[in-house]
């Protein structure tokens, strides 16, 4: 046909009967509830149907240590060795943890283990939801289900389930402390978390950087209150922990195993002996501290609350003498922040986010553990030693990217 002297193109018939194509992300979100249920059932099946699916050794320590409170002077003499003959596991936590866990020893262990697993899943979902809230994405419940379903199979969560660890609950407590503006609630949550396990105390750096002085003071007061309660309940054992055992990394576990993803662990594997806090370890910590400070400033500190606590937590993980893979639960909110947060549109964010996801789903430190004859042997071939820096190097890359990505985008 001609219109004003021009020949128009033929227009084909428009199909109005076929439904529009649904994006893959939307299809996944529709399936989110089912995928979450399948993931949970698969995890429970792994625990109960696969030989050695989970040994709950740390949960045994929690329960056994709590039970030891009934025997005077026995808390820090207690060890669990039924499934770990090469390393009898002592109770390495503050005495307040034994008081908190005390009711657990009144129940059959099988019941405790099942409830514990459900609690881990609920806490993981809580971590995801609070992370979303901190990014202003609280309406995305189905996305939260997907992250929970996927997170169950990342290495930090796999080892949490295997050992029956408590770290997911502690991460949730710190995130809730960051998300609330109530100074007393922030202080209460951080203080209690640090009273159960010392590692959450690093969150105090976030509140110092955010100049939330009341929260800092309250968290310190609550922590010392847990010490006081412990002193009243277990007396000499509390004194023994805080004057003799605190800081004894050898008592916590083998420094050189690939599961220890801290600077001290990584440098020790390269040197072939425990590096302690020697020059190389201090240099590594110093470099990380500088990158963390630059990253903190780049995101405006506590203006990005999730980004801020992630920067602090990454620094704390490599600073600690021992950071087992189950300590790295912080990688779940980190991946969410990289892929959905305020910097997600910048070049490199998706590479880091998907890169962390690949590392944690593969479980690189776990794979490397098969190449070490025992957990106590520190020395190993150079390529395995350097490969054992995987989380540390990825942390440096992440902090460096946060520190300089905005400049690069400008």
UniProtKB/Swiss-Prot annotation:
GO molecular function terms listed in the Swiss-Prot or TrEMBL record: GDP-Man:Man3GlcNAc2-PP-Dol alpha-1,2-mannosyltransferase activity; phosphatidylinositol alpha-mannosyltransferase activity
Keyword set includes Transmembrane: yes
Pathway(s) served: Phospholipid metabolism; phosphatidylinositol metabolism
Principal EC category: transferase
Domain of life: Bacteria
Primary location: membrane
EC code(s) of this entry: 2.4.1.-
Effect of residue 67 to A: No change in activity
Pfam family, one: GT87
One record GO biological process: glycolipid biosynthetic process
Regions crossing the membrane: 31-51, 96-116, 160-180, 188-208, 214-234, 276-296, 306-326, 328-348, 351-371, 384-404
Location of the protein in the cell: Cell membrane
Annotated membrane topology: Multi-pass membrane protein
Stated family: Belongs to the glycosyltransferase 87 family.
Name of this chain's protein: Polyprenol-phosphate-mannose-dependent alpha-(1-2)-phosphatidylinositol pentamannoside mannosyltransferase
Gene for this chain: pimE
């Amino acid at each position: 046909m001609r219109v004003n002297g021009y020949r128009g193109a033929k227009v084909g018939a428009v199909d109005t009967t076929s439904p529009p194509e649904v994006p893959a992300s939307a299809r996944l979100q529709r399936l989110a509830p089912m995928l979450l249920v399948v993931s949970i059932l698969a995890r429970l099946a792994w625990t109960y149907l696969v030989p050695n699916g989970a040994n709950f050794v740390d949960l045994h320590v929690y329960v056994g240590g709590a039970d030891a409170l009934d025997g005077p002077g026995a808390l820090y003499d207690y060890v669990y060795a039924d499934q770990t003959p090469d390393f009898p596991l002592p109770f390495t936590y503050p005495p307040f943890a034994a008081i908190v866990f005390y009711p657990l020893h009144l129940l059959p262990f099988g019941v405790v283990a099942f409830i514990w697993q459900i609690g881990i899943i609920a806490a993981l979902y809580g971590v995801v939801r609070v992370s979303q809230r901190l990014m202003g994405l609280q309406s995305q419940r189905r996305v939260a289900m997907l992250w929970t379903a996927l997170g169950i199979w990342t290495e930090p969560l796999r080892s949490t389930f295997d050992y029956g660890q408590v770290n997911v609950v502690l991460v949730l407590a710190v995130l809730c402390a960051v998300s609330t503006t109530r100074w007393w609630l922030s202080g209460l949550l951080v203080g209690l978390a640090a009273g159960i396990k010392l590692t959450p105390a690093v969150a105090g750096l976030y509140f110092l950087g955010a100049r939330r002085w009341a929260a800092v003071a309250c968290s310190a007061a609550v922590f010392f209150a847990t010490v006081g309660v412990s002193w009243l309940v277990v007396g000499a054992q509390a004194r023994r922990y805080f004057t003799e055992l605190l800081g004894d990394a050898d008592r916590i576990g083998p420094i050189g195993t690939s599961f220890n993803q801290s600077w001290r662990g990584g440098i020790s594997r390269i040197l072939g002996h425990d590096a302690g806090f020697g020059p190389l370890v201090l240099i590594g910590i110093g470099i990380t501290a500088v990158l963390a400070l630059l990253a903190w400033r780049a995101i405006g500190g506590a203006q990005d609350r999730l980004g801020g606590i992630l920067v602090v937590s990454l620094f704390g993980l490599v600073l600690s003498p021992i950071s087992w893979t189950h300590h790295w639960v912080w990688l779940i909110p980190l991946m969410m922040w990289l892929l959905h947060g305020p910097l997600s549109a910048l070049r490199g964010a998706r590479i880091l986010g998907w890169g962390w996801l690949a590392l944690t789903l593969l479980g690189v430190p776990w794979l490397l553990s098969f190449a070490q004859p025992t957990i106590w042997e520190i020395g190993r071939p150079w390529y395995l030693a350097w490969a054992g820096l995987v989380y540390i190097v990825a942390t440096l890359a992440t902090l460096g990217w946060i520190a300089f990505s905005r400049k690069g985008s400008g």
